[in-house]
């Protein structure tokens, strides 16, 4: 994944470990998640390569910053605008089937002149290449061999387990992003409460001092004492 322009502020790139490929051809596209800091008044774009005839799911959340909103757009490799959202806190979008090439994801914070945003997004691929590999593995074994359990049943069980495990990872990742956003909100509220509490205490002390000074003036006798 490549960022358009210079990577700004906090950037955390988490990828699954690469899978080794014995034969020729490009390695499979990996799912990934990315957290970055989007400055006020700026737009940040990313490019992600995708194979043909696959499924690409994009999920994003604004987990920090005033308003917790951002503009989002997604373009195909041909430059066709697939998704355009304005001032959203989160979103989930699926492209199926995908085109071979680089998809463009943009996050825009131009509407904000002061507040920067902490944005998390995740890319999830579901390629047909995995199914073809499983089919090739099944064809390498003769169906009339000693095993009584059908290879189709084994393949379906493994595939179901793989899908459930991948979905569990995705759900846990989203829950982690929600937790980070809620924590940022609570910390921001705590800072505001502490600030205004300190202001109120300072005002009360100032009023108390002024009242004491005013009362002292009332009881002061400034008339001259006769000799």
From Swiss-Prot:
Residues 43-125 form the GOLD domain. The keyword Transferase does not apply. Keywords: Cell membrane, Coiled coil, Endoplasmic reticulum, Golgi apparatus, Membrane, Protein transport, Signal, Transmembrane, Transmembrane helix, Transport. Its main location: membrane. Pfam families: EMP24_GP25L (PF01105). PANTHER family: TRANSMEMBRANE EMP24 DOMAIN-CONTAINING PROTEIN. Belongs to the EMP24/GP25L family. Homodimer in endoplasmic reticulum, endoplasmic reticulum-Golgi intermediate compartment and cis-Golgi network. Interacts with IL1RL1. Interacts with RNF26; this interaction is important to modulate innate immune signaling through the cGAS-STING pathway. This is Transmembrane emp24 domain-containing protein 1. The gene is TMED1.
């Amino acid at each position: 994944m490549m960022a358009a322009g210079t990577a700004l502020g906090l950037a955390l790139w988490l990828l699954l470990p690469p899978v080794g490929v014995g034969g020729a051809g490009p390695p499979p596209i990996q799912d990934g998640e990315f957290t970055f800091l989007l400055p006020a008044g700026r737009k940040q774009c990313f490019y992600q390569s995708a194979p043909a005839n696959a499924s690409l799911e994009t999920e994003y959340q604004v987990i920090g910053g005033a308003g917790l909103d951002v503009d989002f757009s997604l373009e195909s490799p041909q430059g066709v605008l697939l998704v355009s959202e304005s001032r959203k806190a989160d979103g989930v979008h699926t492209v199926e089937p995908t085109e071979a090439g680089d998809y463009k994801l943009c996050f825009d914070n131009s509407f904000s002149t002061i507040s920067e945003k902490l944005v998390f997004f995740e890319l999830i691929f579901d390629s047909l290449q995995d199914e073809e590999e499983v089919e090739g593995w099944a064809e390498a074994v003769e169906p009339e061999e000693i095993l009584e359990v059908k290879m189709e049943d084994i393949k379906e069980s493994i595939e179901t387990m793989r899908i459930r495990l991948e979905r569990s990872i995705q759900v846990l990742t989203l829950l982690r992003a929600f937790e980070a956003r809620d924590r940022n909100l609570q910390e921001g509220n705590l800072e505001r409460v502490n600030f205004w509490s300190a202001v109120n205490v300072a005002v009360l002390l100032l009023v108390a001092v002024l009242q004491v000074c005013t009362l002292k003036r009332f009881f002061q006798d400034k008339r001259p004492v006769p000799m």
